[in-house]
Amino acid sequence: MKFAIISAGEGSRLSQEGVALPKPLVQLNGVAMIDRLIQIFVRNGADKVVVIINNESPLTKEHLAKLQAEAEIPLEVVVKTTPSSMHSFYELSPYLQDDKFCLTTVDTIFREEEFSTFIETFKQSETDGYMAVTDFIDDEKPLYISTDSALDITGFHDAVSY
């Protein structure tokens, strides 16, 4: 299974709050967010990890180059500034063909045990895709979904849709 990380944002909110590091390198419990995700992906059977970063991220690019040299699995880095996460997904799409994949943003926070259950369930399914969602919103531009009674996603929205 392939895993991909969108890490091409500007991190403008963090810098406004006085955080000097780029978002992927901000530490949670002593581990950079990007490292945490890659480690979790490896523990969940990743065959390959692909990360997209923007052109204005020399520290992140340097950090990922070090990780590539030490990686247990292929780690691809795409360097391209994109206007949105959807555009970043498009840039990653050639790397994600011919297998199931998991796509996330670098600042996704979750319990590893829940994530592992989610990934294992997806691996065992015949479904085209799964999407993990939450009702907790702390984002400048959240993405909302609508579902039917079977919890199948019926739409993606920029605002709450009833």
Locate each region found by the language model.
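N-proximal low-complexity "stem/linker" segments adjacent to membrane-targeting elements
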Residues: 1-18, 25
